[in-house]
Amino acid sequence: MSEQYFDPKLKIFALNSNKPLAEKIADAVGVKLGKTSVDRFSDGEIRINIEESIRGDQVYIIQSTSAPVNDNLMELLIMIDALRRASAKTINVVIPYYGYARQDRKARSREPITAKLVANMLETAGATRILALDLHAAQIQGFFDIPLDHLMGAPLLADYFLNHHLDENAVVVSPDHGGVTRARKLAEFLKAPIAIIDKRRPRANVAEVMNIIGDVKGKRAIMIDDMIDTAGTITLGAQALVDAGATEVYASCTHPVLSGPAIERIEKSPIKKLVVTDSIELPAAKRIDKIEQVSVGQLMGQAIKFIHENKPVSPLFKNRFHNEEN
């Protein structure tokens, strides 16, 4: 554990979605995780008990709303309510992976905006601040009427490629037009050019690669996205890059959702290595040799300390992507 933190009024609790990451975050802060129990009634209802006093404390709850999304979201809402009723001074919700983020707008008639609904529920339950990591859509920050600090996983992914000298003769590739800003920032850090894969998606979770904008021939292609779900986009893109003359293909993302046929597709693809963070806990079956995880524990732990001490989080991104105080 890091040096013990001096303020006894800072408490960190973890729910069930990603306890290994929660331990790393608490260790980075220098505190032990608070005592709480999460059980189920016989009919499946969630029961939470906070096993220590938090009256007047500044509390941080760590919970990714990853699969099973609805269970993890409900756990979080119930925990927030319990903390509010137990007189916590502040309730800071740390969400390494924000579920329902892809439903951030009405793409068709009569569709909900579920990302906004989740924001409403978190606020209504009693959250006073959100600490999020690589939200799928930037506008989700505006769905909240409480403070939200938004961290980025890209600097950690960039560190991996730099430390392994993979930035040499590299081109950073966005798998679609929507990810160009993310790719450009990574490219600036790696001092590499960018390329874009132009694709069409005929239906949900199915992607068709059309063409590549930019020069990838004879280069090491590094693809970056915020999340990989069924891996259709990333694997089709990798094959398109090889067909266009890339010497090798690496892929990276912050959130390894990896549902359905994702692992099989990655195994069969020309991707040499997929670099992801631990925002979502990977079960043993998904920890294949091609996947490398880097931890966001230190990053999020430092953010918690800065927030608790009323300091800007911008030093976490010094000389990288964020240069202004937040």
From Swiss-Prot:
Cross-referenced InterPro entries = PRib_PP_synth_CS, Pribosyltran_N, PRibTrfase_dom, PRTase-like, Rib-P_diPkinase, Rib-P_diPkinase_bac
Cellular compartments annotated:
Cytoplasm
Residues reported in the UniProt entry to bind Mg(2+) 2: 176
* Gene Ontology cellular component terms for the protein in this record: cytoplasm; ribose phosphate diphosphokinase complex
Record's Gene3D superfamilies? Answer: 3.40.50.2020
Active-site residues, Swiss-Prot/TrEMBL: 199
Q: In which pathway does it act?
A: Metabolic intermediate biosynthesis; 5-phospho-alpha-D-ribose 1-diphosphate biosynthesis; 5-phospho-alpha-D-ribose 1-diphosphate from D-ribose 5-phosphate (route I): step 1/1
Single GO BP term: 5-phosphoribose 1-diphosphate biosynthetic process
List required co-factors: Mg(2+)
Q: In which residues is ATP bound?
A: 43-45, 102-103
* GO molecular function annotations of the record: ATP binding; kinase activity; magnesium ion binding; ribose phosphate diphosphokinase activity
The family this protein is said to belong to? Belongs to the ribose-phosphate pyrophosphokinase family. Class I subfamily.
**Function, as annotated:** Involved in the biosynthesis of the central metabolite phospho-alpha-D-ribosyl-1-pyrophosphate (PRPP) via the transfer of pyrophosphoryl group from ATP to 1-hydroxyl of ribose-5-phosphate (Rib-5-P).
Record protein name field = Ribose-phosphate pyrophosphokinase 1
Q: What organism does the UniProt record list as the source?
A: Lactiplantibacillus plantarum (strain ATCC BAA-793 / NCIMB 8826 / WCFS1)
